[in-house]
Amino acid sequence: MDSIKGTDEKYLTVSELNWYVKQKFDRDPYLRQIFLQGELSNFRFRRGGHQYFSLKDDKSKINVVMFRGDFDKVKFEPEEGMKVYVTGRLSTYEAQGSYQFYAKSMEPSGLGALYERFRQLQEKLAKEGLFAQEHKRPLPLFPDKIAVVTSASGAVIHDIMVTANRRFPHAEIDLFPAQVQGESAAGSLVSAMQQIQARADEYDVLIIGRGGGSLEDLWPFNEEEVVRQVYAMKMPVISSVGHETDTTLCDLAADCRAATPTAAAEMATPALPLVLAEIGQLQTRLLTDIRAVIQVRAQALAQLENSFIMKEPQRLYEQKMQQVDQLSQQLSRMMEVIVKDQGQKLSLLTQRLQHQAPDRRIKQLKQENSYLAKSLEMGIKRILEQKQAACRQAVQQLDDYSPLKTLARGYSYTTDASGNVVKSVQQLVPGDQVRLHLKDGQAIGRIEEIKEEKND
């Protein structure tokens, strides 16, 4: 037994070995944060759960687990065969003794990945209607205040202010500075727009933009949170991001898109000289129209003053007075007809009421009631007499069949010692005591002899 025990102690269980290896993996500092690139394989999206897939290159493959909380932070839709960058740690799945990569974050690989993210987000937001033409709002003709979201330094804000002041100096320009490049730019842009949204009643239009740059430089204007905030603004939005050849999702969500900051300022403001010239033309046309109207009205007034009506104004109401007299006569005749008709109806109703007078009806009902009461009384008396005769007859029949009546005629009946009526000699034996019941009393006797008689 001792030798067997010593042999067992040299061997590890499978669980012990897997646990030991897991500890080695988890304590290795080089395996706690690994930056990995590869191609997605066996990727099947599991809605609302953890994701299990593989990363591979042309020679090897490794299993990957990405828990739900980490996968929810992924900003694109992974697809089978897509090349990605993944960060995470390497450990073992102790229950199966296999090692796997636990992913914490995932990004598409390379510049092509940015275009893929752009395409996926554009398709998603388009389905929601964020770029629909029917949601586009017209720009105000004469804005009082214009909000601008861009970098505090640079040519963008300078070009906007110079152009706006030249075209329409009445408009007030307020800058809400924001970062327009880098990892924190999206949050900065959203924060600036939210400040404007909180004072939406003060501003007539919003300009958001920046100068040119690479796709990576312009990427904050493609972030979903920025695009959604542009769409949600309560005032019209002009987007001017990059050069004319650049198109961002922010441009698509805005109400208008301008190729340059200068073009954005021109769209937001009217050209004052042109406006003044147009106002002058409108003023001239208005004065001409007013003079023409006054002239026409003056001619009409002169004709009216010279008309015979103005010289003999009583003619205006002579015919009306005649019409009033005619209507009065018609009204009087109509009233007479109505009164006569209603009088006839009243007379007819009076006759009908007299014919159906309540006192006559009441008298008739009283007579009917008296007759019915007498009939009921006679019927009850007749039925009572019939019932009394039937009762007397039943009493007589009952008396005729009474045992006492039978005893009175000289008959008797016999009972045994227990009080049972004796109906047959089969109930008795010699020596039994019996009781004879007569009409005026009872007698007690004893059986001396029994003789049977057979009746045919």
From Swiss-Prot:
NCBIfam families: xseA
Major localization listed first in the record, in broad terms: cytoplasm
Keyword terms of this UniProt record: Cytoplasm, Exonuclease, Hydrolase, Nuclease
Keyword Methyltransferase: no
Subunit structure: Heterooligomer composed of large and small subunits.
Entries under InterPro entries matching the protein: Exonuc_VII_L, Exonuc_VII_lsu_C, OB-fold_nuc-bd_dom
HAMAP family, per database record: Exonuc_7_L
GO biological process, one term: DNA catabolic process
An annotated Gene Ontology molecular function: exodeoxyribonuclease VII activity
E.C. designation(s): 3.1.11.6
Protein name per the record: Exodeoxyribonuclease 7 large subunit
Reaction equations catalysed: Exonucleolytic cleavage in either 5'- to 3'- or 3'- to 5'-direction to yield nucleoside 5'-phosphates
Summary of the function given for this chain in its UniProt record: Bidirectionally degrades single-stranded DNA into large acid-insoluble oligonucleotides, which are then degraded further into small acid-soluble oligonucleotides.
PANTHER family from the UniProt entry: EXODEOXYRIBONUCLEASE 7 LARGE SUBUNIT
Subcellular location: Cytoplasm
GO cellular component: cytoplasm; exodeoxyribonuclease VII complex
Pfam families: Exonuc_VII_L, tRNA_anti_2
Family the entry assigns: Belongs to the XseA family.
